[in-house]
């Protein structure tokens, strides 16, 4: 566990960006492949469609576009970016995709690396970047969440194929000294329950030389115990958010927006109900994108900023949760130009 009480970290959220693939797959289209339909999916998940990366697109393209949009909103010169963290579980290059984004941006002065924490990845990356900025060693950081789970979905598994989509989102963080954006956070993991949701390596071994073999480099499709993940989320997310609010001495009625990982509308509604947060303060775009893993939070944040729902000075309670099992939460003020 890593956490803080209310601290003036002097870190501002000054820009956001997002990007999604062009190809849309609607619920009824999935019903042509597996035994499901639009009503069944929407009733149980809130998802109406999802977007998937096609032949002329890539995860790095989406992540770069999201980063460019965040940099433009922040009005930064790319040469002043010190750090780029890409939160992803589906890199195009297992040795690291963030440096390719750095190159695409022309941010030659930035350190760039990947971070993996599944659907909690964006929050883990956010806290990691904030630590660098709070130390004084860096001033500006891009935090990107991007995933392409469509390539790891078993499209004949009704339990999982209806849930996931592809996308990217980014935020620009700045060490401001006197204006605190991030005021509280907490991160947690429980590996004992990791089997509830995983994308594991295959257990296939091939002969190498006499007396020795090697494991084949391939992964199995996503496996999920939906009921267990739901119970985990509706139990742990309210606890971790409640602890942060208590530490920061902020009442739930002071929250302007509840921004949760976009996994299932029932989870969003259950958490909001625990804090008596009205539905109009709960941010959701599940209907249009489904679960885009590490991208859901920054993608939703950017949409709400650009359509003027989120305004400068708004207080946002945020939580991510997913495979690992891992979960986290953050409380921050938005200080962007919109």
Swiss-Prot record:
Matching entries from SUPFAM superfamilies are given as: Thiolase-like
The question of whether Lipid metabolism is a record keyword is answered with: yes
Swiss-Prot/TrEMBL catalytic activity: malonyl-[ACP] + acetyl-CoA + H(+) = 3-oxobutanoyl-[ACP] + CO2 + CoA
Q: Region ACP-binding: which residues?
A: 262-266
- Report the record's Gene Ontology biological process terms: fatty acid biosynthetic process
Question: What does the entry list under GO cellular component?
Answer: cytoplasm
Q: Which CDD domains does UniProt cross-reference here? A: KAS_III
Q: In which pathway does it act?
A: Lipid metabolism; fatty acid biosynthesis
Q: Pfam families annotated for this entry? A: ACP_syn_III, ACP_syn_III_C
- Residues at the active site: 119, 261, 291
Gene3D superfamilies in the record: 3.40.47.10
Q: What class of enzyme is it?
A: transferase
EC number of this enzyme: 2.3.1.180
Q: Which UniProt keywords apply?
A: Acyltransferase, Cytoplasm, Fatty acid biosynthesis, Fatty acid metabolism, Lipid biosynthesis, Lipid metabolism, Multifunctional enzyme, Transferase
* InterPro entries given in the database record: ACP_syn_III_C, ACP_syn_III_N, FabH, Thiolase-like
Mind listing the GO molecular function terms for this protein? 3-oxoacyl-[acyl-carrier-protein] synthase activity; beta-ketoacyl-acyl-carrier-protein synthase III activity
> Which cell locations does it reside in?
Cytoplasm
Family matches, as PANTHER family = 3-OXOACYL-[ACYL-CARRIER-PROTEIN] SYNTHASE, BETA-KETOACYL-[ACYL-CARRIER-PROTEIN] SYNTHASE III, CHLOROPLASTIC
Q: Which NCBIfam families does its entry note?
A: fabH, PRK09352.1
Q: Which HAMAP family match?
A: FabH
Q: What the protein does?
A: Catalyzes the condensation reaction of fatty acid synthesis by the addition to an acyl acceptor of two carbons from malonyl-ACP. Catalyzes the first condensation reaction which initiates fatty acid synthesis and may therefore play a role in governing the total rate of fatty acid production. Possesses both acetoacetyl-ACP synthase and acetyl transacylase activities. Its substrate specificity determines the biosynthesis of branched-chain and/or straight-chain of fatty acids.
Its family remark reads:
Belongs to the thiolase-like superfamily. FabH family.
Q: What is known of its domains?
A: The last Arg residue of the ACP-binding site is essential for the weak association between ACP/AcpP and FabH.
Record note on quaternary structure? Homodimer.
Name assigned to this protein: Beta-ketoacyl-[acyl-carrier-protein] synthase III
């Amino acid at each position: 566990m890593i956490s803080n009480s209310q601290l003036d970290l002097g870190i501002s959220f000054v820009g956001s960006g997002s990007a999604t693939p062009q190809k849309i797959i609607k619920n009824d289209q999935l019903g042509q492949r597996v035994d499901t339909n639009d009503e069944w999916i929407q009733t149980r998940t809130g998802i109406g469609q999802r977007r998937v990366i096609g032949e002329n697109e890539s995860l790095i393209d989406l992540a770069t576009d999201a980063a460019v949009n965040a940099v433009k909103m922040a009005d930064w010169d790319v040469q002043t970016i010190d750090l780029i963290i890409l939160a992803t579980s589906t890199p195009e290059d297992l040795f690291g995709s963030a440096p390719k984004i750095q190159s695409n941006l022309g941010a030659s002065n930035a350190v760039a690396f990947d971070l993996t924490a599944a659907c909690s990845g964006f929050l883990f990356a956010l806290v990691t970047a904030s630590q660098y900025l709070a130390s004084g060693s860096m001033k500006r950081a891009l935090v990107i969440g991007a995933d392409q789970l469509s390539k790891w979905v078993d499209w004949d598994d009704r339990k999982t194929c209806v849930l996931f989509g592809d996308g990217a989102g980014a935020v620009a963080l700045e060490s401001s000294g006197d204006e605190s954006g991030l005021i509280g956070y907490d991160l947690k993991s429980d590996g004992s329950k990791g089997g509830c949701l995983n994308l594991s390596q295959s257990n296939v071994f091939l002969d190498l030389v006499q007396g020795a073999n090697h494991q084949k480099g391939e992964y199995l499709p996503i496996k999920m115990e939906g009921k267990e993940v739901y119970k985990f989320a509706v139990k742990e997310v309210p606890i971790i958010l409640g602890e942060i609010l208590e530490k920061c001495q902020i009442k739930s009625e002071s929250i302007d927006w509840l921004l949760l990982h976009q996994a299932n509308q029932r989870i969003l509604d259950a958490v909001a109900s625990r804090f008596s947060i009205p539905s109009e303060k709960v941010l959701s775009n599940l209907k249009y994108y489904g679960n885009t893993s590490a991208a859901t939070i920054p993608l939703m944040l950017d949409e709400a900023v650009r359509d003027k729902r989120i305004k400068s000075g708004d207080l946002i309670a945020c939580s991510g949760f997913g495979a690992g099992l891992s979960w986290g939460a953050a409380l921050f003020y938005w200080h962007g130009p919109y």
